[in-house]
């Protein structure tokens, strides 16, 4: 699928490719070497001499309509008389090429060199790294051009900064061909000019290539503008560069990193959006910003080699930004507050809230506090909208007095600048509407209460007023007037008990006032906002409890009077009672199966007695009773009987 889009322009070398694996900093990666065997170089180079070549620093965007799914993509190379460091590698993998390398994204101006997601050189494998060249993508300028300033000399094993060595005829022909295209020159002259760049002395080529390198960058830029090529190529070319300043001749194989990524092509069939996980404050996101930075740095094209020489020995380009250039770029972007445009089209089915993400997250780093505050205002306004709906709650006392200030606060919050201003304003309107609804319910409810009070008969307990605002608990508990205590039941419009477990428990009620129910007003002062019918039930229950206490006290007084009227029996009369010996267990003594005083059955060997009224008891039980009261415990007959 789409393999024809990534076929090499030139046939594969007959010598084949060599592959090896290496270990970098604890992580294992596969490195592919594209250098054919030494014996096959001349034969491969001779096959390439007659082919007309496309400039190696540029790739055609219209050529890639489909992408290869292989993580190790096919490449386009040109092998000539010797190893050419100007050859390019196109990474066409969709999964590995959507994201630009970190250093590539961080380069705001045209850099001499960049690298893409490769490991740091460790101390233990510095020789291994310095032995072979590293394949790296050239930095893309803000006009979409890729610049190379690092050349690798396979014969010397070192990077050439001044110019191409005598064996770099392919690279020299590319520069000459590009300059000849700007001027209408026959093809024969182009071929003849290439022959001029065949093997020369190393000193002469190095002294003359310094201007050619700058000319290559300028000519490629002019050719870009003349042909109106898009600023986003479909493939990111990768140039072969040296791995160290002083490399040995033993290991010269160029290494290709499979994890190098390039920007997504505008010709993709299904564009996808991606969110940068790295710190991308230095990455220019719009084409205009790329072009502006390129124009600012137009005079620095000759500084590519200088930046290349300023690199570390391991071959890493250090990000060097002039302070004035960074400040100018920050001043250019920050006042605009324009959301950054991604280089790929957004898929509407992939991220639903991508606009909000761009709105709050894609601005500069100094705007983080603004969108956090906006989200907080939106969240608070949503809470106020939910809490201010007075139609679904029972109207509570004092709420109508405190609702207008809350509505004003919500409205003032809504007028504050920010994305959540409209939501806050809507919340304030909802709060005011809730307060108006509460006032309307109160006005409708008050006349009905007055009519019911007027129709009460004498002796009935009136419904307690709960609209009075002079109670002490209302002034102390501001949050308790709008939220009910779970223990104190909440009633709806029909006075039906409802259990709402989500209400707050901040309500503090002085439950000691429940002890003062003599007049039924203590609870009304403590919880005056509770439904009056509920308080009526509580008052009735308290009245019944008081009546029971009065009845019990009366019965006790009657018992005392009886005891006073019946004095205890004399000791002689108690001893004169007859004794009856129980002969069998659980046997009936007289008509009784058990003693009425201790309620226990008669057991064999116990002593029972009979009173003159013919009631039987245990003699010890009835003796104690008669010492307190001279009556029968069952029938209250006098003992001893009167004469």
From Swiss-Prot:
Reported tissue expression: Expressed in various regions of the brain including the cerebellum, cerebral cortex, medulla, occipital pole, frontal lobe, temporal lobe and putamen. Highest levels in the cerebral cortex.
EC number annotated for this UniProt entry: 2.3.2.27
Ranges where the record places region Disordered: 1-363, 380-454
GO molecular function: ubiquitin protein ligase activity; zinc ion binding
Catalysis performed (reactions): S-ubiquitinyl-[E2 ubiquitin-conjugating enzyme]-L-cysteine + [acceptor protein]-L-lysine = [E2 ubiquitin-conjugating enzyme]-L-cysteine + N(6)-ubiquitinyl-[acceptor protein]-L-lysine
Zn finger (RING-type) start-end: 595-636
GO biological process, one term: protein ubiquitination
Chain intervals with Low complexity compositional bias: 200-209, 410-439
PTM comment, free text: Substrate for E2-dependent ubiquitination.
Compositionally biased spans, kind Basic and acidic residues: 95-105, 145-158, 173-183, 213-227, 289-310, 320-362
Modified residues (Phosphoserine): 265, 365, 367
Keywords linked to the UniProt accession: Metal-binding, Phosphoprotein, Transferase, Ubl conjugation, Ubl conjugation pathway, Zinc, Zinc-finger
A GO CC term attached to the entry: cytoplasm
Superkingdom, taxonomy of origin: Eukaryota
Lyase found in the keyword field: no
Modified residues (Phosphothreonine): 277
Role of this protein: Has E2-dependent E3 ubiquitin-protein ligase activity. Ubiquitinates MAGED1 antigen leading to its subsequent degradation by proteasome. May be involved in protein sorting.
Domain notes: The RING-type zinc finger domain interacts with an ubiquitin-conjugating enzyme (E2) and facilitates ubiquitination.
Assembly behavior: Binds ubiquitin-conjugating enzymes (E2s). In vitro, interacts with the ubiquitin-conjugating enzyme, UBE2D2.
Protein's UniProt name: E3 ubiquitin-protein ligase Praja-1
